[in-house]
């Protein structure tokens, strides 16, 4: 039984129409398992939003609730300023989703597949098919059979199919999974362009480097609980990764681990990889020198979204 605690809009009138998606206290339990716990999300128009977490984190359950496929146990979901507890289809018509590999007729051309879909939707002219194929750079291959398409072309045709109805929110689940480098770049280049057309893109992916390149903001969850929610650049500039070579890495790791302001210490052969507050290198040197441990090398290592993700999730990958 779904319980929605409040039917009042989550969005106040001063925020305008920029907020496309908002959840408040979103929770889903399967028996005793709490798959999603008290999740608060917000997605604005023009934004590419990354939704990240290890396997089993609750990403698919969350997407299912947003799309009306899974009933929340408690909490609220609001699309375009309206709760999904009302006439949800009015809101969901404005949402497009590509979940895993799109399903098309393999023996039909790209054009004919979209034409069949347009007939099923109704009131979509042929000019719109031309427009969306051109939008995803497939117009010159529209006459080719679907089963002759590369993986990247199939994924772009899937995105084209969602664009037939001009969605204001596009949900993409692993859109570059299984693609070769060329296909990955094609999809990666397309995603921010879609958001810049007064839409929002909700992106689920385990390819953290790709997320770092295309997303404006990310939420990271683990076991249904939000661990981080911030602009990508903010996450990348919060700390400092230092690569340190010392004469006694074991003792050095013990000393640094006991410093309350050190975030983490990992050992890689003769090196220590230290996640610490910005501009703390001199303090680290001082702490080691007081125990007669001296760094022969201390250099900055670039902070990546992957390193932030692994730190927050305790080493769980997104695969």
Predicted regions mapped to residue ranges:
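ABC transporter nucleotide-binding domains
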Residues: 18-23, 28-222, 228
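Structural motif detector for alpha-helix initiation sites
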Residues: 110, 232, 302-305
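ABC-family P-loop ATPase nucleotide-binding domain
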Residues: 1-27, 315-319
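Short low-complexity, flexible loop/linker segments enriched in glycine and/or proline
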Residues: 219, 311-314
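Generic structural signal for secondary-structure transition and capping sites
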Residues: 48, 103, 158, 168, ...
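Short, charged/small-residue-rich alpha-helical element at the C-terminal edge
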Residues: 241-312, 319
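ABC transporter nucleotide-binding domain
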Residues: 186-275
């Amino acid at each position: 039984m779904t319980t929605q605690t409040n039917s009042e809009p989550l969005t106040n009138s001063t925020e305008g129409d920029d907020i496309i998606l908002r959840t408040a206290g979103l929770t889903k339990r399967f028996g005793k398992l709490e798959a999603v716990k008290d999740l608060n999300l917000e997605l604005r128009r023009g934004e590419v939003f990354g939704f990240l977490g290890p396997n089993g984190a609750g990403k698919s359950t969350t997407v299912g609730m947003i799309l009306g496929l899974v009933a929340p146990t408690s909490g609220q979901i609001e699309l375009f300023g309206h709760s999904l507890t009302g006439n949800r289809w009015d809101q969901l018509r404005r949402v497009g989703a590509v979940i895993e590999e799109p399903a098309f007729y393999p023996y039909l051309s790209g054009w004919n597949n979209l034409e069949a879909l347009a007939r099923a939707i109704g009131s979509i002219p042929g000019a719109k098919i031309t427009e969306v194929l051109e939008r995803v750079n497939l117009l010159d291959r529209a006459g080719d059979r679907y089963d002759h398409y590369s993986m990247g072309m199939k994924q772009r045709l899937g995105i084209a199919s969602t664009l037939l109805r001009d969605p204001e929110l596009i949900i993409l689940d692993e859109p570059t999974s299984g693609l070769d480098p060329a296909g990955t770049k094609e999809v990666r280049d397309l995603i921010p362009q879609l958001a810049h057309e007064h839409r929002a893109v909700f992106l689920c992916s385990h390819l953290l480097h790709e997320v770092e390149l295309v997303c404006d903001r990310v939420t990271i969850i683990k076991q249904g609980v939000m661990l981080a929610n911030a602009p990508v650049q903010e996450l990348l500039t919060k700390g400092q990764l230092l690569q340190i070579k010392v004469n006694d890495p074991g003792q050095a790791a013990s000393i640094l681990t006991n410093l309350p302001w050190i975030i983490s210490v990992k050992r890689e052969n003769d090196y220590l990889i230290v996640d610490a507050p910005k501009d703390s290198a001199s303090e680290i040197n001082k702490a080691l020198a007081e125990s007669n441990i001296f760094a022969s090398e201390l250099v900055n290592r670039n902070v990546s979204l992957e390193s932030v993700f692994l730190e927050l999730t305790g080493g769980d990958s997104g695969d």
